[in-house]
């Protein structure tokens, strides 16, 4: 995967720190709605999926696996925005399944102003979330400087 900046295609390894910071700033500007996590009702968690989520340091402070597990138990069956770096190339949305409690993770891709989730164009995260019923907002711990 790479990133499209100013009409040119750069691989992740070719991006300068300045380009990555610009990409980070664009992601924040384009995704202000993502400064919240969307929660549903109670349920259980699939512990195997926790190994796929190590750090949440873009919209969430860094947390250990134990802290992440506790977060899912405290606000289960939610939809969470997750990432592990300061660009939007590894941005995921994690959803708890209401029936079996498993955690489903979909990769988010931003192409210009459009949002693609697993290849489908939703234009914005808000449009994607409108496909679900009974969501309410829960504030994220936002840690831009660490």
From Swiss-Prot:
Reported induction: Expressed in the early phase of the viral replicative cycle.
Keyword terms, alphabetized: Early protein
Homology family: Belongs to the asfivirus MGF 100 family.
Role summary: Plays a role in virus cell tropism, and may be required for efficient virus replication in macrophages.
Name this protein carries in UniProt: Protein MGF 100-3L
């Amino acid at each position: 995967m790479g990133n499209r900046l100013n009409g040119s295609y750069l691989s992740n390894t070719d991006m300068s720190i300045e380009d990555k910071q610009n990409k980070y700033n664009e992601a924040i500007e384009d995704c202000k709605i993502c400064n919240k996590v969307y929660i549903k009702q109670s349920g259980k968690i699939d512990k195997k999926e926790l190994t796929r989520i190590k750090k949440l340091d873009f919209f969430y402070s860094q947390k250990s696996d134990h802290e992440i597990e506790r977060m899912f138990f405290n606000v289960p069956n939610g939809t969470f925005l997750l990432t592990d770096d300061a660009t939007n190339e590894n941005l995921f949305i994690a959803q708890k399944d209401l029936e079996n409690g498993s955690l489903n993770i979909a990769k988010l891709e931003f192409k210009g102003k459009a949002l693609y989730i697993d290849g489908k164009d939703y234009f914005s995260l808000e449009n994607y979330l409108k496909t679900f019923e009974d969501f309410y907002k829960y504030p994220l711990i936002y840690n831009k400087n660490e």
